[in-house]
Amino acid sequence: MARNEEKAKSMLNRYLQLKGTESKQEERRPYLSNECDSLVDAEKWRRQILKEITRGITEIQNSALDEYKIRDLNDHINKLVREKGHWERRILQLGGPNHRALAPKLFDADGKEPLGTGTYRYYGEAKNLPGVAELFEKPEQTLHGTEKKTRQDLYKYIDSDYYGYRDDEDGKLEEIEREYEKYAIEQNVENWKKQQRDKFQINTNRFNNNNIKNSIAINKNTENKDEINIDDDEENDDNNNNNNNNNTENTENIENIQEEEEKEDIKFKSYVSLPSTSQIETILLEKRKEELRKRYTQN
């Protein structure tokens, strides 16, 4: 073994190794997975990232490393894991296999899963860093001696009773609703009575207004009737005066005509029925009412 190591470290072997690396054109991995359009190249870059991840995980198992080196290595491994996920999505877009569904889980050298959830995990000696263990400790016991319940434990007690689907079975809700129902019925009855009183008050006010209007109309009709009677009396007086004058003038003629009437026995008969004064008054009163009715209805 010592002889082989000496051969590897010899000047000629190192020269040949350097010459071989210079002859090869090293390809750099694209910064973004979308820049690669070949499925073969995408698979190659994914395998390269896997090699770097395994190399980093084996290196981070060394407990002799200082804290800063361990943190840098752990950050670099998480970065490579995220980059591997980008290349796996790109391979799936190019028509390749779904490596995310087929790939096995990552384990430490001890065969344990790394601590952490989501996109950041702690590998190897990073678990023993200060402050990391406290993040993943079990919840402490409360003052009553019981462990602090998680959200999943709380959801176990959520059932139909929690949502109130079986509140009617104990009968307490019916008693409360019965009291409230009685109160609601009383309130509705009082409101109905109040509405009826208001309607009755409105109807009485309308009836009183109609009575006032009718009384005003009757008073006006009586005044008009009195005026008509006064006019009729004046006309009758004028007619009486004229008749007296005519009677004095016609007395002489009547005496002369009486003899002829006695001889001829003329009988006068009216073929047209003339209305009386009471009928004329009623007709005029009806016309006056009709005019007042039209006037109030228009207003």
UniProtKB/Swiss-Prot annotation:
User: What does the sequence similarity comment in the record state about its family?
Assistant: Belongs to the ISY1 family.
How it assembles, according to the record, is: Identified in the spliceosome.
Q: What does this protein do?
A: May play a role in pre-mRNA splicing.
Its BP terms in the Gene Ontology are:
generation of catalytic spliceosome for second transesterification step; mRNA 3'-splice site recognition; mRNA splicing, via spliceosome
| The name this protein goes by in its record | Pre-mRNA-splicing factor ISY1 homolog
Which gene holds the coding sequence for this protein? isy1
List locations, semicolon-separated. Nucleus
Q: Where is the composition biased (Acidic residues)?
A: 229-238
Keywords, in A-Z order: mRNA processing, mRNA splicing, Nucleus, Spliceosome
For this record, the Gene Ontology CC terms, alphabetical, are: catalytic step 2 spliceosome; post-mRNA release spliceosomal complex; post-spliceosomal complex; Prp19 complex; spliceosomal complex
Q: Where is the composition biased (Low complexity)?
A: 239-252
The record's section on InterPro entries has: Helix_hairpin_bin_sf, Isy1, Isy1_sf
Q: Specify where the region named Disordered lies, as residue ranges.
A: 223-252
What sections of the sequence does the record tag as coiled-coil?
none
What PANTHER family does the record point to? PRE-MRNA-SPLICING FACTOR ISY1
